[in-house]
């Protein structure tokens, strides 16, 4: 107990799923994702830090943070949505970005799907190369 208050471990630590390390993320993507996980409300899976706040916390520029946020969205780890704020005089103004941490299984499924598409494309390319090589060999022999 610190200063007479019971400390809650959940307020001081957060868990990053092991699967994050098999999704082919760059170090910058992992850092930004980890920061968003640190900030998230554990009940709603949402948080509202600005690009500037994230950048200050992880040592990146606003543009770099934006790039990694877009990459995390594309890889289905997070979803984002702009918020609106009403000013005191009643005008609507852009607020911070709302980040929602998506279930890790969605990202795993998407990653696996993309890997399968790459494998099928690679197999098709190899079959085409083999067919072309056979065709070339067949026609080369006729020309002689």
What are these regions (language model features)?
Residues 1, 12-14, 39, 43:
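Functional cleft and adjacent loop/helix regions within the main domain
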Residues 1-9, 64:
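Generic detector of solvent-exposed, compositionally biased contiguous segments
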Residues 1-4, 74, 97-144:
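Charged low-complexity intrinsically disordered patches
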Residues 8, 18, 62, 114, ...:
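General helical secondary-structure elements
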Residues 9-24:
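Short, Lys/Arg-enriched N-terminal segment that forms or immediately precedes the first helix
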């Amino acid at each position: 107990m610190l200063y007479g208050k019971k400390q809650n471990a959940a307020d001081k630590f957060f868990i990053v799923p092991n699967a994050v390390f098999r999704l082919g993320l760059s170090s910058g993507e992992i850092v930004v994702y980890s920061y968003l996980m640190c900030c998230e409300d554990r009940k709603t899976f949402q948080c509202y830090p600005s690009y500037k706040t994230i950048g200050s916390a992880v040592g990146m520029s606003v543009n770099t943070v934006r790039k990694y946020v877009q990459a995390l969205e594309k890889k289905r780890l997070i979803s984002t949505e702009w918020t609106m704020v009403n000013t005191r005089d009643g005008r609507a103004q852009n607020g911070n970005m709302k980040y929602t941490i998506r279930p890790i299984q969605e990202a795993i499924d998407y990653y696996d799907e993309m890997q399968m598409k790459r494998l099928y494309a690679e197999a098709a390319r190899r079959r085409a190369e083999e067919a072309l090589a056979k065709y070339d060999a067949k026609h080369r022999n006729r020309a002689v």
